[in-house]
């Protein structure tokens, strides 16, 4: 079926299996082949996703492309990815869990950058629901020698994470 073909194509792109994705294009419906080209382009040149006018169509496949492209962009330009995704978030009705997952992904990559603390604090998700994001923010606070932030963030972690030896050490050290 066309939906199954798109699903497999999407999984191939996400797994970075370009040859498999190219092979799977032949099984897509004719109307989806142009979107497949856009998907590949968003994968290989993530900055392409910043052209918002190209991806305004309300379509589940377009939303797949946008989410994937934003994640790819976040790997090297997390600040750009965040601002671009906020614009898309106003246009498209993303699934809340997919949207939150994308914000977490962007947040983790923002934590590797300097001077992004304000952006991290203003992500539209509750950090206590995403321990991997909190851990990334703790590591950033440690790099920045922001001890009060380290303590605040460690306390945001769920109990089972707080009792891990590494976080117990830093909590005691602070």
Where are these predicted regions, by residue range?
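Generic helix N-cap/helix-start motif at coil->alpha-helix transitions
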Residues: 1-7, 15-20, 27-36, 45-48, ...
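Amphipathic alpha-helical segments within well-ordered protein domains
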Residues: 9-10, 70, 155
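Inward-facing hydrophobic residues that define packing positions of alpha-helical scaffold repeats
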Residues: 24-25, 85-86, 120-123, 154-155
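Non-catalytic extracellular/periplasmic "stalk"
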Residues: 42, 50-52
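Non-catalytic all-alpha helical scaffold/repeat segments
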Residues: 54, 78-93
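Alpha-helical structural signal with a strong bias for long, charge-/Ser/Thr/Gly-rich
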Residues: 84-88, 106-109, 143, 153
């Amino acid at each position: 079926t066309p939906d199954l073909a798109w699903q497999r194509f999407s999984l191939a792109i996400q797994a970075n299996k370009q040859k498999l994705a190219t092979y799977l294009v032949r099984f897509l419906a004719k109307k989806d082949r142009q979107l497949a080209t856009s998907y590949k382009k968003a994968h290989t040149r993530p900055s392409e996703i910043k052209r918002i006018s190209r991806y305004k169509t309300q379509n589940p496949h377009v939303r797949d492309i946008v989410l994937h492209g934003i994640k790819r962009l976040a790997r090297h330009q997390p600040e750009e990815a965040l601002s671009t995704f906020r614009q898309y978030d106003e246009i498209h009705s993303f699934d809340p869990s997919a949207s939150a997952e994308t914000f977490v992904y962007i947040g983790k990559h923002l934590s590797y950058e300097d001077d992004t603390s304000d952006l991290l604090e203003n992500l539209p998700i509750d950090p206590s629901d995403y321990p991997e994001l909190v851990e990334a923010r703790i590591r950033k606070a440690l790099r920045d020698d922001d001890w009060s932030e380290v303590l605040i963030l460690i306390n945001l972690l769920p109990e089972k994470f707080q009792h891990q030896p590494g976080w117990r050490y830093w909590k005691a050290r602070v």
